[in-house]
């Protein structure tokens, strides 16, 4: 407990696997359909869909921005990139899971390209802030792109280089976004799913830099 107590003081420090909370085997129970569009939340989907995973701060606002895009079939919020299996929201907020808040996006590539989703991602938040996003501070708010295919990984890295060049022109700092192969996504509790559609006056800390990714 000494090690965990020390980490709790500084939520900008990722715990090791040994320090992380143990979690549980049982995943969160989720509704069958998306609250906004009525599509299946987790499938079955048609064979032409693809999957993308983004973390850009608090997942409430991030999910709304992504479900608003034409061609997006479903969105699910969850936790990824850490050690604790099937964590609770409170556990993630403790800083003792190493997870960040993410949105799993199910999309039709003939209607919206992965590059277009990357443009939404970069422009919707500030990817230079490390373990925070605006006033939201902690490892669970770090910026990430978790890629489900090698093609996505190449595209994400290329877009990061493009956006970094634009940030420098604007006098902004270095991108801290993690760009990696997709780890396991543990879905968040049902009340977090499509939260801002259920609670239109709810908190949304999403905010970009004003810098645009070239088309």
Curated annotation (Swiss-Prot):
Chemical reaction(s) catalysed: L-methionyl-[protein] + [thioredoxin]-disulfide + H2O = L-methionyl-(S)-S-oxide-[protein] + [thioredoxin]-dithiol; [thioredoxin]-disulfide + L-methionine + H2O = L-methionine (S)-S-oxide + [thioredoxin]-dithiol
Catalytic residues of the enzyme: 58
InterPro entries referenced in this protein's UniProt entry, alphabetically: Met_Sox_Rdtase_MsrA_dom, Met_Sox_Rdtase_MsrA_sf, MsrA_MetSO_reductase
Pfam families: PMSR
Keyword annotations from UniProtKB, A to Z: Oxidoreductase
Superkingdom of source: Bacteria
Oxidoreductase among keywords: yes
GO terms (BP aspect): cellular response to oxidative stress; protein modification process
Alphabetical list of PANTHER family matching this protein: MITOCHONDRIAL PEPTIDE METHIONINE SULFOXIDE REDUCTASE
Protein's job: Has an important function as a repair enzyme for proteins that have been inactivated by oxidation. Catalyzes the reversible oxidation-reduction of methionine sulfoxide in proteins to methionine.
Entry-linked HAMAP family: MsrA
Family: Belongs to the MsrA Met sulfoxide reductase family.
Protein name: Peptide methionine sulfoxide reductase MsrA
Organism: Pseudomonas savastanoi pv. phaseolicola (strain 1448A / Race 6)
């Amino acid at each position: 407990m000494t090690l965990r107590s020390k980490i709790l003081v500084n939520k900008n420090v990722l715990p090791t696997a040994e320090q992380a909370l143990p979690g549980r085997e049982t995943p969160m129970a989720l509704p069958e359909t998306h609250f906004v569009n009525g599509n299946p939340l987790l499938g079955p989907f048609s064979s032409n869909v693809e999957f993308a995973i983004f973390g850009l701060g608090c997942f409430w606002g991030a999910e709304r921005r992504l479900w608003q895009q034409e061609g997006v079939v479903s969105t699910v919020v969850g936790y990824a990139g850490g050690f604790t299996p099937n964590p609770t929201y409170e556990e993630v907020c403790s800083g003792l899971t190493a997870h960040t808040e993410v949105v799993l996006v199910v999309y039709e590539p003939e209607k919206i390209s992965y590059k277009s989703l990357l443009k939404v991602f970069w422009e919707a938040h500030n990817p230079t802030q490390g373990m925070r996003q605006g006033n939201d501070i902690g490892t669970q708010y770090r910026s990430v792109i978790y890629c489900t295919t090698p093609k996505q990984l190449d595209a994400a890295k290329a877009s990061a280089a493009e956006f970094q060049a634009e940030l420098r022109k604007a006098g902004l700092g270095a991108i801290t976004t993690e760009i990696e192969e997709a780890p396991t996504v543990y879905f968040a509790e049902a009340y977090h799913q499509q939260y801002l559609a259920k609670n239109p006056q709810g908190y949304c800390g999403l905010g970009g830099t004003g810098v645009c990714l070239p088309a």
